Amino acid sequence: MIFVDFASSVLHAAFNALTTALRTQTVTDSLSTSDPRGALCRLGERQAERYLKRLGYIIVGRREKIWRGDIDLIAVDGRTVVFCEVRTRTDSLHGHPVETIGYTKQRRVSELAAAYLRKHHLGDCHARIDVVAVTLHGPSGRPLVEHYQNAFDSPP
């Protein structure tokens, strides 16, 4: 029993150190401000980030470059590393933002999340992939933010 308590406290300390280290990473935004589509994406990501923070998530990465792609938001929810794919639309006239995430994109996000976990030696951490859909001009005239936890296969 003492060994289990010791192992648990070591794991807890390591997770706290990870959270602190990830929080201090330098965050860069590679999109040009003259790119209207990029500006729309950034606006949606900011809405998603505010929403997740209100839920108690700790944001540890934004537009994190991994391998040959990027992950929109990386957060910690309790003891789980959460990789968030953010999809933004100005309105819902041409479909829901989630409808733009096909099988290829799902596989790509899952591969990027697995690469991130390997890069940071987090193979033993719980992880999941969430989708945050942002419709900027929702029915109420305000942005509508929808959060889908564990939206598709998490990294192996």
Per-region residue spans from a language model:
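Domain-level recognition of nuclease-like catalytic cores that cleave nucleotide substrates
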Residues: 5-6, 119-156
